[in-house]
């Protein structure tokens, strides 16, 4: 996503148009056109606070998971920031697997295997509280 706020504006605009034109065929937002399968979990990630990707949550019917950088980081690089706040590629994979486990598509053991493979410490302090 290049701009969560632009996607939200599109969805809000379409929603408003549909409300104001009840006798016409409803328009479909970009989100509805691109994420139309209600079975597939969506993992939305941002280098900003979770509220940034969360602003589109009401327009997504799919199971929705959000990763963001809530709190204060101790990072001098973007890569360090993503690792500290658990939003790097490894945590995106981990959250995607968790979403599939939650839906019953995978066994829980897959999560542990991924954590081992990517050296994810289950006892790492929560970045929001550290």
Language-model segments: residues:
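Thiamine diphosphate
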Residues: 1-130
């Amino acid at each position: 996503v290049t701009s969560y706020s632009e996607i939200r504006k599109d969805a809000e605009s379409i929603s408003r148009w549909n409300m104001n034109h009840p006798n016409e065929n409803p328009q479909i937002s970009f989100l509805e056109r691109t994420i139309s399968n209600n079975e597939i979990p969506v993992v939305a990630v941002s280098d900003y606070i979770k509220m940034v990707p969360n602003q589109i949550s009401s327009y997504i019917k799919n199971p929705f998971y959000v990763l963001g950088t809530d709190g204060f980081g101790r990072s001098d690089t973007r890569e360090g920031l993503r690792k500290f706040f658990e939003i790097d590629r490894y945590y995106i994979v981990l959250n995607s697997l968790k979403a599939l486990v939650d839906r019953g598509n995978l066994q829980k053991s897959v999560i542990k295997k991924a954590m081992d493979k990517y050296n994810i410490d289950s006892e790492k302090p929560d970045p929001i509280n550290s």
